[in-house]
C-alpha cells in the first residue's frame, strides 16, 4: 500500500506547487515617445541631450508625471507626462533659493504625498560647497524651500544618488556617499539618511560601517530603500544590502550584479512580492529581480526599448523608477545619462487557471482513491 500512496502524493504536491508558478513580461509603453523611448533630442527637445547634463529623474505618484533635472542651458526641472513623455512645463525655482554646489541640481525624488526633493551635487562637502536638498510642496509650488543644508555631514561627496521613502513627517531621504580627490580621509562607504519631524525641515545622519565591504563609494551610483531601515546600493559589480540604526550600518548581503555596469535601481512591491528594477548604464538594459529572498535576487526578465548606437555614459549615472502599480502590473521608467528615457510595462503573469484546477483535481482523485482502496 505504501508504494501506491507515494506516486499520488508526489503528483498532488507537484501540481499544487505548479499552481504558484508565474511568468513575466517587460514591454515598451508605446504611448511614451511613440515607441517606449524618448531619445536624446527627439522632436527637437533640448533638455534631454548627450552632454552628461541629465543625471536624475523621478516619478510623481500624485500626478503620474516625471520630473527631470536638466542642466542643459542652465538648471531646469522639467515636468513630463508619464504616459506620453510630452513636455508639461517646469517647476518654479523661485529667486535666489537654489544656489551652490558642484552642480546646483543633480538627483531628485518624490514622496508618497507628492512633495518633491532635489539634491545638489557637492564634492567634496565642505565650507565651499554645502550639500543641499530642496523641497517643493507639489508641482505647482511657487518656490522651493531649503529642506536640508550641511557643510559637515561628510568630507566626501554627496548627490550622485538619492531615494525617498514614505510621506509627511515620516519621509526619509538617503544619499550615497563617496570619496573625492580632496575629500579628506575616511572609508566613505556609507550613506546620509535625512529625517524630519514636520515634513518640511530635515536633519541628517551619516551611516557608516565598520570594516569593508562596503567599499568607498559603494552606494554612489545606485541606491534604493527596501524598507524604512534597509537600503541597497551599488557602484557596479556588487550590490550592498544593509540595515541601519542611527549612525550604525550593518552589511547584510553582497550579491554580484549581472554586469559591472548595472547601477541605478529601484524597489517596489507588486502583488505582494518585492521586485528590484535595475539599469545597465552602458547598454540601457533594464533588468527585473524577484526579491522574495533579498540575499539572493532572482532575475525574472529584462528589456530594452532603445535602438541604434547609443552615446556613451562614461560617468555611469542615471536613474530607474517604478511608476504606476496596478494589480500585477507596473510601469517602469529608466534613464541612462545621454541615452534618453525609456518607459516599459512590467507584468507578473500568474499560472493559467487550468493548472490550479488540475491541482485541485489531483487532490480529489487522491481522496477518492483513499476512500475505495482495498
Segments (PLM) and residue ranges:
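Short glycine/acidic-enriched loop and turn motifs that connect beta-strands
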Residues: 72-76, 122-127, 178-185, 238-239, ...
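A short, hydrophobic C-terminal helix/tail in secreted or cell-surface proteins
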Residues: 351-369
Amino acid at each position: 500500500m505504501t508504494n501506491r500512496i507515494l506516486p499520488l502524493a508526489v503528483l498532488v504536491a507537484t501540481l499544487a506547487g505548479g499552481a504558484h508558478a508565474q511568468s513575466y513580461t517587460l514591454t515598451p509603453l508605446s504611448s511614451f515617445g511613440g515607441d517606449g523611448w524618448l531619445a536624446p533630442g527627439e522632436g527637437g527637445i533640448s533638455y534631454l541631450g548627450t552632454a552628461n547634463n541629465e543625471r536624475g529623474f523621478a516619478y510623481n505618484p500624485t500626478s503620474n508625471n516625471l520630473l527631470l533635472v536638466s542642466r542643459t542651458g542652465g538648471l531646469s526641472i522639467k515636468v513630463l507626462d508619464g504616459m506620453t513623455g510630452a513636455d508639461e512645463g517646469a517647476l518654479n525655482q523661485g529667486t535666489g533659493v537654489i544656489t551652490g554646489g558642484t552642480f546646483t541640481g543633480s538627483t531628485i525624488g518624490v514622496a508618497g504625498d507628492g512633495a518633491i526633493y532635489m539634491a545638489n551635487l557637492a564634492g567634496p562637502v565642505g565650507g565651499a560647497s554645502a550639500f543641499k536638498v530642496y523641497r517643493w510642496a507639489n508641482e505647482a509650488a511657487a518656490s522651493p524651500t531649503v529642506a536640508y543644508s550641511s557643510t559637515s555631514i561628510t568630507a566626501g561627496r554627496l548627490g550622485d544618488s538619492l531615494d525617498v521613502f514614505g510621506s509627511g513627517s515620516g519621509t526619509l531621504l538617503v544619499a550615497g556617499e563617496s570619496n573625492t580627490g580632496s575629500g579628506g580621509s575616511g572609508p566613505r562607504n556609507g550613506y546620509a539618511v535625512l529625517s524630519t519631524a514636520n515634513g518640511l525641515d530635515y536633519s541628517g545622519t551619516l551611516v557608516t560601517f565598520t570594516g569593508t565591504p562596503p567599499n568607498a563609494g559603494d552606494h554612489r551610483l545606485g541606491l534604493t530603500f527596501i524598507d524604512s531601515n534597509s537600503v541597497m546600493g551599488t557602484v557596479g559589480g556588487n550590490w550592498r544590502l544593509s540595515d541601519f540604526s542611527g549612525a550604525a550600518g550593518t552589511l547584510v548581503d553582497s550579491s554580484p550584479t549581472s554586469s559591472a555596469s548595472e547601477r541605478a535601481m529601484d524597489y517596489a512591491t507588486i502583488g505582494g512580492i518585492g521586485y528590484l528594477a535595475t539599469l545597465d548604464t552602458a547598454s540601457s538594459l533594464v533588468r527585473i529581480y524577484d526579491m522574495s529572498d533579498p540575499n539572493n535576487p532572482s532575475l525574472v526578465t529584462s528589456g530594452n526599448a532603445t535602438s541604434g548606437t547609443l552615446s556613451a555614459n562614461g560617468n555611469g549615472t542615471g536613474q530607474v523608477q517604478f511608476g504606476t502599480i496596478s494589480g500585477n502590473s507596473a510601469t517602469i521608467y529608466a534613464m541612462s545619462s545621454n541615452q534618453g528615457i525609456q518607459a516599459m510595462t512590467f507584468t507578473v503573469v500568474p499560472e493559467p487557471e487550468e493548472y490550479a484546477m488540475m491541482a485541485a483535481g489531483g487532490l480529489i482523485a487522491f481522496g477518492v482513491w483513499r476512500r475505495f482502496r482495498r
